[in-house]
Amino acid sequence: MIAARGAPEIEKAKLRLEIAELQAVLNAKEQQLLELQSTISTGASNGGEPESKQDHQKLSNDDIARYSRQLILPDFGIGGQLKLKNSAVLIVGIGGLGCPAAQYLAGAGCGSLGLVDYDQVERSNLHRQTLHTVARCGLSKAESARIALLELNPHCHITCHASLLNRFNAMDIMHGYDVVLDCSDNVATRYLLNDACVMLGKPLVSGSALKLDGQITVYNYGTQGPCYRCIFPVPPPPEAVTNCGDGGVLGAVTGTIGAMQALEAIKLIVGLGDVLAGRLLIFDGSSCQFRNIRIRSKRANCHVCSDQPLITQLIDYEVFCGMHATDKDNPLQLLEPEQRITVVDYQKSLQDKPHLLLDVRAQAEFEICQLPQAINVPLAQILDGSYLQQLDAQFKSSGFPIVVVCRRGNDSQIAVQHMKNQFPEHFIRDLKGGLHAWTNQIDENFPIY
């Protein structure tokens, strides 16, 4: 019986070893492919400018065969295709918006594409960032997208900028392109791109998507087309900003908006149709309705695009906005140190003692995972006051300490700040770093999302 049980275990061990060896071979092949793509003439450089744009005067037979379905459009034709072939478009952010935008621009025959993204591919990206694959997890998003785009259209020149765009490198990177697409997911980058586009005289196709909703417009186009600062002179407070990582998004929504960004870029290059300048297109995915609303024209006293601008060079946009220029965790600092407790101290001093653990995430997130004994009270119920009386009664009857937790330690700070304003005498603490800190420091098997 012992031998019989041992045989399957040996076989399982052999299979695990074989899988590990195959994975190593796959990783090596991916690296070889990446190196090969870097050397081919249609590949990418990592320099500060797009590949040298050529003045193509005619289309090749391959071009005619490849782009025939758009060549026969009456308002497009040979002239429109040549304009695309001689154009260069910069896409900032190769995520949920940037992937479909890049895919359609490369497919349509855009001559040069610049891809800007500092980040690497992660599993949580794959449901919406459709240029990337499981095999390329850990690879630069710009490099991963380049591989996919060259497979789609090897005639497209692609320049990768695998770095974080900032005030020091933005002008050098952007100046060689005709159109810029803002596919980022943070406020600081939006202001940076806007100001740089105004200073360089380039149109900015701006898209955003969150949950089931999306928006798109074109800034800095035409004599009366506003820039981003005309609409939003002052950035919102950091605690009011929600990105895809915090609020969630459906992949098909980002695909819809990203494809429309590619469409607007093509229209700008070719001179096709009415450009979406001075208008905001709003997409409601829950009802599949589009609304097209008029937005204000240029602001006469705009700090960057007016006749007498106050901003004539790029500034520190992280300081200006009070938040990082990435879509990564953007930790708030709303509380004093004594109003917070680390996950290590919580486990040592409170977890096994009577206390009230409030999880202020939305119910859908609470159902994904939760700490033992946690009670789900969404942040909205604390801010609107509907739970405060019950909380006060619970504290007065038990005297138990109150610890507040959320996903990353931001919403919990907002909740603690609000509750302390109402009940300054109560023992209320924020669990610093939230559930992400719990996974990283206490229990690596606790789900992270």
Swiss-Prot record:
Pathway participation: tRNA modification; 5-methoxycarbonylmethyl-2-thiouridine-tRNA biosynthesis; Cofactor biosynthesis; molybdopterin biosynthesis
Domain of life: Eukaryota
Cofactor binding, per record: Binds 1 zinc ion per subunit.
Recorded catalytic activity of this chain's protein: [molybdopterin-synthase sulfur-carrier protein]-C-terminal Gly-Gly + ATP + H(+) = [molybdopterin-synthase sulfur-carrier protein]-C-terminal Gly-Gly-AMP + diphosphate; [molybdopterin-synthase sulfur-carrier protein]-C-terminal Gly-Gly-AMP + S-sulfanyl-L-cysteinyl-[cysteine desulfurase] + AH2 = [molybdopterin-synthase sulfur-carrier protein]-C-terminal-Gly-aminoethanethioate + L-cysteinyl-[cysteine desulfurase] + A + AMP + 2 H(+)
The entry's keywords: ATP-binding, Cytoplasm, Metal-binding, Molybdenum cofactor biosynthesis, Multifunctional enzyme, Nucleotide-binding, Nucleotidyltransferase, Transferase, tRNA processing, Zinc
Residues that hold Zn(2+) according to the record: C227, C230, C302, C305
Gene Ontology cellular-component annotations: cytosol
CDD domains named in the record: RHOD_ThiF (cd01526), ThiF_MoeB_HesA_family (cd00757)
E.C. numbers: 2.7.7.80, 2.8.1.11
Cofactor: Zn(2+)
Family label: In the N-terminal section; belongs to the HesA/MoeB/ThiF family. UBA4 subfamily.
Active site (catalytic residues): C244 (glycyl thioester intermediate), C406 (cysteine persulfide intermediate)
Compartment(s) where it occurs, according to its Swiss-Prot or TrEMBL record: Cytoplasm, Cytosol
Molecular function GO labels: ATP binding; metal ion binding; molybdopterin-synthase adenylyltransferase activity; molybdopterin-synthase sulfurtransferase activity; thiosulfate-cyanide sulfurtransferase activity; URM1 activating enzyme activity
The protein's name: Adenylyltransferase and sulfurtransferase MOCS3
Purpose of the protein: Plays a central role in 2-thiolation of mcm(5)S(2)U at tRNA wobble positions of cytosolic tRNA(Lys), tRNA(Glu) and tRNA(Gln). Also essential during biosynthesis of the molybdenum cofactor. Acts by mediating the C-terminal thiocarboxylation of sulfur carriers URM1 and MOCS2A. Its N-terminus first activates URM1 and MOCS2A as acyl-adenylates (-COAMP), then the persulfide sulfur on the catalytic cysteine is transferred to URM1 and MOCS2A to form thiocarboxylation (-COSH) of their C-terminus.
Residues that hold ATP according to the record: G96, D117, S124, N125, L126, H127, R128, K141, D185, N186
Pfam families tied to this protein: Rhodanese (PF00581), ThiF (PF00899)
Enzyme category, top tier: transferase
Residues of the Rhodanese domain: 351-447
One GO process term, biological-process aspect: Mo-molybdopterin cofactor biosynthetic process
